[in-house]
Amino acid sequence: METLTSSSQSLISSPMSKKDYSSEIICAFDIGAKNPARTVLEVKDNSVRVLDISKLDWSSDWERRIAKDLSQYEYTTVLLERQPRRSPYVKFIYFIKGFLYHTSAAKVICVSPVMSGNSYRDRKKRSVEAFLDWMDTFGLRDSVPDRRKLDDVADSFNLAMRYVLDKWNTNYTPYNRCKSRNYIKKM
């Protein structure tokens, strides 16, 4: 198990060939310059496998770093956490959509954050709790390092899992606070 000593090392990963036509590869990005995060899930035969959960760094040379991060897998769906219109991170969304437009068959979807609540701190706390519960479910809790800043990887993981569960019409109580199916917005 690799810890997050380097900004682009994986928190959790599994080996997989770049092309596996009988599965769906879902990637979710929690957008940000200093603390972006990516989760990659494989959905195959009604089961979910965690391929990768990574903390990334796009603080400098961001075009090259994002392109490298996008080129590691062949995704069928890419989920991007929606950003406010005037956010400096909107440029990342447009870059990712443009990069994948001609180079990939992936469907790119901007989605609302999974958790809603009274305060930013409360939302982040609930996101980390749901993430750790899922890590227990997948038997990967021991792979998660003790860190104070897990909210970014938690947010990316929860984006991906909510998408999978919605496709299967499955309710998961921590995600129920968002309006069902209304979280997907086109940019």
From Swiss-Prot:
The keyword Lyase does not apply. Its cofactor is Mg(2+). Keywords: DNA damage, DNA recombination, DNA repair, Hydrolase, Magnesium, Nuclease, Phosphoprotein. Binds 1 Mg(2+) ion per subunit. Its EC number is 3.1.-.-. It is an enzyme of class 3 (hydrolase). InterPro entries: HJ-resolvase_A22 (IPR006932), RNaseH-like_sf (IPR012337). GO terms for molecular function: four-way junction DNA binding; magnesium ion binding; nuclease activity. It comes from the Viruses. One of its GO terms (biological process) is DNA repair. The keyword Repeat does not apply. Belongs to the RuvC family. Poxviruses-type subfamily. Plays a role in DNA replication by cleaving viral DNA concatamers to yield unit-length viral genomes. The concatamer junctions contain inverted repeat sequences that can be extruded as cruciforms, yielding Holliday junctions that A22 protein cleaves. This is Resolvase OPG149. It comes from Vaccinia virus (strain Western Reserve) (VACV). The lineage of its organism: Viruses, Varidnaviria, Bamfordvirae, Nucleocytoviricota, Pokkesviricetes.
